[in-house]
């Protein structure tokens, strides 16, 4: 099984790229954000806890994140590989993932870091709208946002509570203080490929696929 990690700050496009690249390379796509949102929708104690952290722009504690993600990964048996989007987000999570994969006779094949400047991240996130049905993202000013409908499924659009300018800045502060060290962690292992996230979306996709194939 070939496992790939996507690193990048909120708004870097790693979610969009993860879906596209997973489809192109026939890999499973696991987005931590989606797992958390499903937990919130369940309305149980775990979901309420996750919701409280996300609304404050804080990272969900390691012990909760690790438990949720590893449980999901254990159920993905009939796949050729996995793209992990949004996990790990701390060195502790990375070490827990390494340990779990070793126990399964697996490892990390390549780590993709999508690099986008901070001011651009704030602009992207503050203007992001999301479909309530399929979670497709849109930017303020586009036709879909003007109409208030998703072009994929016709679902209604909304702005997430954690996409306000104030919360966005806090999320980025948390990211760069707690998650950025992962870049050096994986670089030291010779697994990291840094991709310029300011390029056209299609070009970013090409560069990511090339990096993954070269890393095999």
From Swiss-Prot:
Binding locations of ATP: 11-16, 128, 199
Residues given in the record as AMP binding sites: 32, 37, 58-60, 86-89, 93, 160, 171
Subcellular location, principal: cytoplasm
Pathway assigned in UniProt: Purine metabolism; AMP biosynthesis via salvage pathway; AMP from ADP: step 1/1
GO BP of this protein: AMP salvage
PROSITE patterns registered for this protein in UniProt: ADENYLATE_KINASE
Domain of life of the source: Bacteria
Residues binding Zn(2+): 131, 134, 150, 153
Region (LID): 127-163
Region feature (NMP): 31-60
Family indicated by similarity: Belongs to the adenylate kinase family.
Subunit (UniProt): Monomer.
Alphabetical list of HAMAP family matching this protein: Adenylate_kinase_Adk (MF_00235)
Function: Catalyzes the reversible transfer of the terminal phosphate group between ATP and AMP. Plays an important role in cellular energy homeostasis and in adenine nucleotide metabolism.
PANTHER family: NUCLEOTIDE KINASE
Name of the protein in its database record: Adenylate kinase
Species annotation: Dehalococcoides mccartyi (strain CBDB1)
Taxonomic lineage of the native organism: Bacteria, Bacillati, Chloroflexota, Dehalococcoidia, Dehalococcoidales
This protein's encoding gene: adk
């Amino acid at each position: 099984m070939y496992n790939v990690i996507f690193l990048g700050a909120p708004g870097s496009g790693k979610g969009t790229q993860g879906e596209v690249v997973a489809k192109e390379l026939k890999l499973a796509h696991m987005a931590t954000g989606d797992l958390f949102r499903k937990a919130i929708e369940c309305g149980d104690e775990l979901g309420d806890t996750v919701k409280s952290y996300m609304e404050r722009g804080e990272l969900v504690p390691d012990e909760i994140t690790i438990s949720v993600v590893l449980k999901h990964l254990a159920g993905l048996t009939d796949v050729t590989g996995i793209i992990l989007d949004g996990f790990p987000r701390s060195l502790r999570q990375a070490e827990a993932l390494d340990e779990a994969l070793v126990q399964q006779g697996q490892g990390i094949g390549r780590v993709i870091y999508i690099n986008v400047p901070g001011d651009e991240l704030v602009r992207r996130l503050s203007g992001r709208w999301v479909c309530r049905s399929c979670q497709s993202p849109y930017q303020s000013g586009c036709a879909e946002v003007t109409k208030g409908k998703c072009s994929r499924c016709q679902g209604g659009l909304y702005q997430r509570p954690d996409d306000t300018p104030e919360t966005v800045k806090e999320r980025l502060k948390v990211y760069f203080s707690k998650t950025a060290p992962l870049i050096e962690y994986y670089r030291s292992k010779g697994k990291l490929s840094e991709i310029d996230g300011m390029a056209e979306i299609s070009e970013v996709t090409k560069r990511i696929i090339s990096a993954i194939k070269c890393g095999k």
